[in-house]
């Protein structure tokens, strides 16, 4: 497995992996597939030196991706980022998400990050278990904030401090 910065030519595969996650209703509140065009601005908001998007390659195929997103976008939150991880169906349960999350934690200090957050549906047990296994703790609970196919779903906010202030 090779983790690298995403480049614009990866965007079509990033979108395809994201769209493949929608039908399960586990990982995103989007209900319909998103378009390549609708994700171009999102892609360009990321920077390899600040809020990167990484892809994980397995045998030259993109098996999954991770993005860092600014938390609330206000200056006082500059050292906090939300992370999102999506894995292609063929590569789920193969360690791709684990490798991406490990890399995110390891590289966070170099990105100026002290806190990582994950907003995870309460019924997404695989993701909750993954984040727990890396020492993330439950920092918040948002009851019934999403409605997926007529079912109200809760969000759990998982957090981890990466380095303490001196």
Q: Which stretches of residues belong to each language-model region?
A:
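A short beta-loop-alpha structural element at the N-terminal edge
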Residues: 2-14
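Conserved GNAT-fold acetyl-CoA-binding loop/helix
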Residues: 15-42
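Conserved catalytic-core motifs of GNAT/GCN5-like acyltransferases
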Residues: 70, 75, 117-120, 137-154
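Conserved GNAT acetyl-CoA-binding A-motif
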Residues: 108-120
């Amino acid at each position: 497995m090779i983790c690298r910065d995403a480049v614009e030519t990866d965007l079509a595969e990033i979108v395809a992996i994201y769209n493949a996650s929608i039908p399960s209703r586990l990982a995103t509140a989007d209900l319909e597939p998103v378009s390549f065009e609708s994700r171009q601005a999102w892609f360009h908001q990321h920077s390899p030196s600040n809020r990167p998007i990484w892809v994980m390659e397995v045998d030259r195929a993109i098996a999954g991706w991770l993005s860092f997103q600014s938390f609330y976008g206000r200056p006082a939150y500059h050292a906090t980022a939300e992370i999102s991880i999506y894995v292609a169906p063929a590569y789920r349960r193969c360690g791709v998400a684990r490798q991406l999350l490990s890399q995110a934690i390891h590289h966070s200090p170099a990105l100026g990050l002290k806190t990582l957050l994950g907003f995870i549906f309460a019924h997404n047990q695989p993701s909750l278990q993954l984040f727990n296994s890396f020492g993330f703790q439950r920092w918040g609970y948002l009851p019934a904030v999403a409605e997926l196919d007529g079912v109200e779903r809760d969000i759990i906010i998982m957090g981890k401090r990466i380095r303490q202030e001196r």
